Amino acid sequence: MRYGYFDNEHREYVIDRVDVPVSWTNYIGLKDMYGVFNHTAGGYLLYKTPEYHRITRFRPNGVPMDGPGHYVYLRDQDTGDYWSISWQPVGKPKEHFSCRHGLSYIKYHSDYAGIDAEQKLFVAMDDPVEIWDVKLRNDSDKVRHLSVFTYLEFSFHQVDMDNKNFQMSLYATGSRYEDGVIENDLYYEEDGYQFFTSDFTPNGFDSLRDSFIGGYRTERNPLVVEAGVCGGSFEKGGNHCGVLQKVLTLQPGEETRLLFLLGEGGIEAGRKMRQKYTQARADEDFARLLKFWDNKLSCLQVSTPNEGMNTELNIWNLYQSEINVMFSRFTSFIEVGGRTGLGYRDTAQDAMTIPHSNPDKCRGRIIELLRALTKEGYGLHLFEPRWFEPEEKPQSFKSPTVVPTPDKSQIVHGLKGACADDALWLVTAIVQYIRETGDMAFAHQVVTYADGGEGTVYEHMKRILDFSARQVGINGICKGLRADWNDCLNLGGGESAMVSFLHHWALRNFIALAEQLGEMKDAAEYTKIAEHVKEVSESVLWDGKWYIRGITAGNRKIGTQADTEGRVHMESNTWAVLSGVADHEHGISAMDSVDEYLYTPYGLMLNAPCFTTPDDSIGFVTRVYPGLKENGAVFSHPNPWAWCAEAILGRGSRAMKFYNALCPALQNDIIEVRQSEPYSYCQFVVGKDHTAYGRARHPFMTGSSGWAYFAATQYMLGIRPDFDGITVDPCIPADWKEFSVSRKWRGAEYHIHVTNPDAVEKGVKSITMNGRQVRKLPVLPVGTVCDVEVVMG
């Protein structure tokens, strides 16, 4: 069953059946002001931080679902009939409504009672202003008298206080109206103001929620809309909203357009922004937004026989990856802002995967991570970048609602709080950034440590690798410490196969960089460490058919052929190959086991069989319901590791089988099973040991997106940037006859056409660039455009 379709020409997903099983969300904004909204305009807006500067209110996990939002009501003043452009909250017959999710914008459309209407939400490019662009057309054959009402509910800035501490929040906010501008005032803050205004003189307003909604009513049937006239309410204290009314008369066929602006600042800011954001300026900003994404997406475009892959790689996969790099993990309908900051491992992997489209942001994220590294060599698992920025001038008074000033003696946790994998991801992120940009000088940039002192980027990397080399258990395998990548499987602090494999991968990438920098002594020293890690890992972790997951603190191996639960684990087997530890024979056997035990039509399960008996020596994973999340679900993030592993082994058909199973775009016609957005990778898909098998949950905010993009472009399509050129080494299904990739790299553009005359899955017979045979694609002068022909065989 389908609820919509991909409009790739306009880079939009069109929801033409709006009663989707769960909210289908999207993001607006690119910088400090951003928000998340669903297909019916439910959602919230914030400024800089989802915890301390919420602008509009949201009630998560509620009934009716996912509201309030940023709504526009239309009322026929002659009949009293009213509806909302976004279908909800009024909920007229669904056949009259649709939604288009675009890249950082959303369009809601209604065609009801002879009135064609559109509400477009996006954020201005240069100012913290959300623009509601509303267009109306009278498609009936008679004159129509209409009223337009907006509705948003302002939030107390601090999200926990807004949801729990009403004795404070209800008496610390006020509202007023002047000259067509509603001002929301958070009195506890010096600059705690928001405005809501329009590009016309309103016929009425309300800024008290309860006056607008009325007693014993909801957003579905607000009293003011039902009555057709605003009450002009405002007050100090209470719950506040943004309601502006416009009375219109439309002749048959007549169109009109209205702008509404929600932004940071008080009445004066509202006046200024209203003057600035005319309809022409709104059009200009929207055109700039489209151009912004044009530039991003043009960095890499593909044409393959797989339309689902084309849709993902050319539009939605990169878009989702960019959202994660920009906004991290704590702004969604699942993570609603009660905790904020950067997760170390997630941020490092995000930055690793898309430096080609967002080098400045990836570089910035890498520096933030370097500053959150201790001299011991471990990273702070969850941190706020501002903790390590230059001291700001303290505010003139202490407020319980603003972002607190950190106690720097308390923010650096000890080894007990360290996750063994966190900082290892950063090593490869740095190397990938340098391979992409050619910025070798970055390795010598001096950056501070979280616990004092400073060192170069290169020195930070050495501390990370040395830390992992020291933190080994009695079997010589890296300790898992608080946890490795799988937070729920920490083996009681035992030894982690995944961390040892990840250590080897990081070492290999570091050695390549050291050689480029001329640090040959370091290259030799760390090569010896890598060889030792490989030797110990092979001797301890190989179990005859696959690699074990780890060893508990009590020295019990987990993930062996003798186990009845948790026998085969995806992380250890994929990383044995991806890291370069496994030889070809062991790699084939390990990945055959992954296919045999973990494959489902919806992706690869994290482990099998599921754990059913609690065992705290293994970890909390044994207390997770079978088939959910870390216990036997199709956990999306590590799935691309399997695509990489199969590509390394030369099995393109197997890699594509795994890719297709997880690909959201290829599940567009089974929404009765998937339920969630078909344009977004989700955190997990419910596994086969659960009654909801195949159901996807937690969209957008997941590292699976960046890894899916990285694995598909660099390992499956095989376009890999290196220090001195681009390697082209595809691994594809044998029945692919050809594919093309357009890749921008260091200011040049490479049009790569790959043919497969011998129907192989891996192997390159020849590479020709502008008629000349080459081994890899060289760095070219900025502005160069070249044609590349690659023949597999």
List the model feature ranges, each with a label:
Residues 768-772:
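Short strand-turn-strand beta-turns centered on an Asx-Gly dipeptide
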Residues 721-754:
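Surface beta-strand/loop "capping" patches
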Residues 1-346, 359-372, 398-405, 432-436, ...:
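Anionic coordination/interaction segments
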Residues 332-340, 382-418, 450-456, 477-496, ...:
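Carbohydrate-binding/catalytic loop surfaces
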Residues 272-278, 288, 312, 358-371, ...:
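Extended, well-ordered alpha-helical scaffold segments
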Residues 778-793:
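C-terminal beta-strand-rich structural cap/linker in extracellular carbohydrate-active enzymes
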Residues 342-347, 351-476, 497-504, 632-655, ...:
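Aromatic-rich carbohydrate-recognition surfaces in CAZymes
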Residues 149-151, 166, 380-382, 502-618, ...:
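Catalytic cores of carbohydrate-active enzymes
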